[in-house]
Amino acid sequence: MKKIVVAIIIFASIAVVAFARQHDQGVEVVLPAKVSKEDMSGSIFSRPDMVEMERYGTNTLDVVTLMSSDGKFASGVYKAGKHRAEYTVEEPYGVDEFLYMVEGKMTLTSADDTVQEIGKGDAVTIPREWAGVIDTDGFLQLWVIYSEDGSGLE
């Protein structure tokens, strides 16, 4: 038992020294991006990096919680009021996006007239090639986007 304790102490000491060396060499520590319950209750929109803009004829609030180092993948929280957005085969959705609806709902009507209702607690993944119409009275959602060339995240 004593040997195990000594081995753990030695291992922990080596790990601490290695971490300290990385820190001294300017290696950036990368952390996961957490969105807390408090954030989701609205405090996230008080962050200094929150972007407020007019989009689709309504006021929107958007906070990016993570941007990948290559600029092609991101996640965040988005709030929008009532609006309608239309996408065509010639000008489709443009990004691969996963959405989790925290509040509100939206209706997705695809180009073939297939209708999907996405409400509180539902999730949907919209492919970049999607064509159709989004109708909503407003929502709060968590989003994750992949954009092959990064242009959809600008």
Task: For each feature predicted by the language model, list its residue ranges.
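Conserved short histidine dyad/triad with adjacent acidic residue
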Residues: V63-V64, A74-Y93, I118, P127-R128, ...
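Short, conserved beta-strand element in jelly-roll/cupin
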Residues: P92-L108
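A short, N-terminal "cap"/entry segment at the start of jelly-roll beta-barrel domains
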Residues: A18-A74
